[in-house]
């Protein structure tokens, strides 16, 4: 588990800390577990929930089954490890696995655990009862009774069938990023699969590890759980194929292993060490043989697997030169691209020798300077790859040119949706070398806005796809773990005429929708793109992020805890530019909303666009508002109520929208960013601050 570290405590907004435990968890966690944490009775938990005014929130087991990350995040700063494990009803081993393996969860939480004292129930004083009664009145006033149930997703079905059979690969919207196939073969519903098929999708990609699907010799623990995963995965592949959907495994190999887990007889294979994880250096013949045998075992035992997408430079420790800074002496004479090609070619040979038709697609993510690739080395890598290995580039990830100005886009983006200079060069080169080529893009959303299933910037998406087609790219991976919703936007990948697509989806209202979407694109062009802003600001939490009167001195964490760390959100020299661009962006978004809301008798599809554009606008407005609040709160003479009043308005608007649609606030790797409880706590937070500023 992550190291427990002493940091400044965060303010709470209930009279007693144990009340915050109830406020954040009532309805998400069984009352007997809350009672066990607080050392009181379940009856007492119910009484105190009623005293707070939240007794109408009903417990739903699905929170623990499908959104345990939400519960972890809600209590990360509130409870110590012992009480957190009790609340989750989770073993230390299971929590450690999730922190280490569930899409960088440990990093997102800050890579450490804030120390916390034990929190136990204590009888309230008369003054605390009085304060609690005031909170009850507030929450009764704003409580929404029919808040939508989590995971009650309704999927769009279109007639956007992909008749040309080019690859349209996506990550399943509802699929968690953990150890899915240990639990079930029915990881995705019939309705979701049917919706993908109807929107032109013919492939699903799923993250996996060879060690979880094949015999793994290097661990002290030898178990056979991989057999169960394999069985479930085979059943799932057959299930998906019944809807015309192929399955691709996304592999980042050979994975490092925890130092404590490594069998000592393999110590000689150790390479680069990062924290508690050690690479098994792929320059060793033993590791190459393992990679060969495991890949061969995989495709022989999962015969209907359509493809493997490899990533050979990434945040995960795989080969010793996956990122700069290796001190391994075994592979010191290798360049990163040589190790990447060694991995890809070894896996391809295993597939070929197995007589399998499983494809290998080499993702070029990280074949770039930030992973220590020198100019020209990505092309050298393509030269080294077997000609039957397919090449995929993250289209927008790299250098862009506007006029005489060059700038970098270092994340998935819909605001800068076009192939970058490096993508154009590499895909053209790979095509000349007779490799099949694919483009990786985002169609639905990105970290610019991840908490709605799609953002309505269809014009940007269509233009991006058009530019890729002009390069000869007709096969696409259409999402990362975010952006997998089966929306009508997916069928853009199989449409060559934007107006026809609009007419098909919006009928007589398509011209008004086109005008509104153009306004969205104009506004989005102002977006002050910066990876720190995407990862560390509240763009993807919006008004659910709590405010604090005093500076917390907490550092923002990746897409999880923005806190009040404004200097990490936006650098000081970019302050005015950020404010001006966000104001312009919001102005255009509101103009787009005005156009859409003027449509008479709008269809459900248009109402959905209005809803998601509203959420998007609210979150951006709140980010700007929180930024100004936190900048100004250090000056005691500043009137902060102007920001608090606006934040309350935005909070109530988002709360209302989220109560109507279970997709709002959900994203596969982070699960639910907010719940009804989150909004109720934020309302108390703002009203108490208003009284004290």
Spans of features found by a protein language model:
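Feature activates predominantly on carbohydrate-active enzymes
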Residues: 64-65, 101, 106-113, 122, ...
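Long, charge-rich, low-complexity intrinsically disordered regions
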Residues: 1-163
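Substrate-binding groove of N-acetylhexosamine-processing glycoside hydrolases
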Residues: 159-165, 185-189, 300, 333-693
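A solvent-exposed, charged loop/short amphipathic helix patch at secondary-structure junctions
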Residues: 324-334
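Aromatic/hydrophobic pocket-lining residues that form π-stacking "cages" and hydrophobic walls in ligand
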Residues: 45, 192, 236, 347, ...
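Short glycine/serine/threonine/alanine-rich loop segments
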Residues: 40, 90, 201, 243-245, ...
């Amino acid at each position: 588990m992550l190291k427990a570290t002493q940091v400044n405590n965060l303010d709470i907004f209930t009279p007693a800390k144990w009340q915050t435990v109830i406020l954040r968890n009532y309805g998400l966690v069984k009352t007997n577990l809350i009672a066990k944490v607080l050392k009181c009775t379940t009856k007492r938990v119910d009484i105190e929930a009623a005293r707070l005014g939240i007794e109408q929130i009903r417990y739903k087991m699905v929170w623990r089954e499908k959104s345990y990350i939400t519960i972890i995040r809600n209590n990360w700063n509130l409870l110590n490890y012992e009480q957190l494990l009790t609340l989750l009803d989770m073993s230390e081993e299971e929590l450690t696995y999730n922190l280490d393996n569930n899409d960088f969860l440990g990093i997102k939480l800050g890579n450490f655990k804030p120390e916390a004292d034990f929190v136990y129930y204590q009888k309230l004083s008369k003054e605390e009862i009085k304060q609690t009664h005031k909170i009850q009145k507030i929450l009764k006033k704003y409580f929404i009774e029919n808040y939508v149930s989590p995971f009650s997703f309704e999927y769009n079905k279109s007639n956007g069938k992909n008749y040309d059979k080019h690859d349209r690969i996506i990550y399943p919207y509802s699929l968690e990023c953990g150890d899915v196939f240990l639990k079930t073969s029915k990881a995705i519903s019939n309705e979701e699969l049917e919706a993908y098929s109807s929107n032109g999708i013919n492939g699903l990609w799923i993250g996996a590890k060879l060690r979880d699907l094949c015999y793994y010799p290097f661990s002290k623990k030898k178990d056979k759980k991989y057999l169960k995963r394999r069985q479930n995965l085979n059943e799932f592949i057959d299930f998906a194929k019944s809807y015309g959907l192929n399955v691709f495994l996304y592999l980042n190999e050979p994975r490092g292993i925890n130092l404590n887990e490594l069998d000592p007889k393999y110590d000689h294979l150790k390479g680069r060490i990062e924290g508690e994880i050690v690479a098994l250096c792929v320059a060793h013949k033993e590791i190459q043989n393992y990679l060969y045998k495991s890949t061969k075992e995989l495709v022989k035992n999962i015969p209907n697997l359509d493809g493997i997408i490899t990533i050979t430079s990434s945040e995960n420790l795989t080969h010793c030169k996956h990122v700069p800074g290796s001190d391994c002496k075994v592979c010191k004479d290798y360049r990163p691209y040589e190790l990447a090609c060694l991995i890809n070619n070894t896996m391809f040979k295993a597939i070929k020798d197995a007589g399998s038709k499983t494809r290998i697609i080499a993702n070029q993510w990280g074949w770039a300077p930030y992973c220590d690739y020198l100019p020209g080395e990505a092309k050298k890598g393509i030269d080294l790859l077997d000609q039957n290995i397919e090449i995929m580039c993250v289209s927008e990830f790299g250098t862009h040119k506007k006029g005489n100005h060059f700038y970098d886009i270092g994340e998935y983006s819909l605001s800068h949706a076009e192939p970058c200079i490096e993508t154009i060069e590499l895909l053209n080169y790979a095509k000349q070398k007779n490799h099949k080529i694919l483009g990786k893009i985002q169609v639905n959303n990105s970290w610019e806005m991840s908490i709605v299933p799609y953002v309505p910037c269809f014009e940007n998406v269509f233009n991006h796809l058009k530019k890729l087609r002009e390069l000869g790219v007709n096969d696409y991976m259409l999402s990362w773990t975010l952006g997998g919703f089966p929306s009508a936007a997916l069928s853009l990948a199989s449409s060559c005429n934007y107006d026809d697509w609009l007419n098909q989806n919006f009928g007589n209202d398509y011209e008004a929708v086109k005008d509104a979407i153009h306004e969205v694109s104009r506004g989005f062009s102002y977006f002050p793109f910066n990876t720190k802003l995407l990862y560390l600001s509240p763009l993807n939490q919006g008004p659910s992020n709590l405010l604090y009167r005093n500076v917390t001195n907490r550092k923002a964490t990746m897409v999880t805890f923005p806190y009040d760390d404004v200097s990490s959100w936006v650098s000081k020299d970019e302050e005015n530019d950020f404010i001006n661009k966000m104001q312009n962006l919001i102005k255009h978004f509101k103009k787009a909303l005005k156009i859409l809301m003027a449509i008479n008798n709008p269809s459900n599809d248009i109402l959905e666009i209005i809803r998601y554009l509203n959420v998007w606008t609210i979150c951006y407005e709140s980010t700007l508002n929180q930024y100004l609040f936190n900048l100004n709160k250090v000056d005691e003479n500043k009137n902060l109520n102007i920001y608090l009043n606006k934040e309350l308005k935005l909070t109530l608007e988002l709360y209302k929208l989220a109560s109507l649609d279970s997709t709002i606030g959900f994203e596969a790797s982070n699960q639910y960013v907010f719940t009804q409880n989150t909004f109720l706590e934020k309302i108390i937070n703002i009203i108490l601050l208003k009284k004290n500023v």
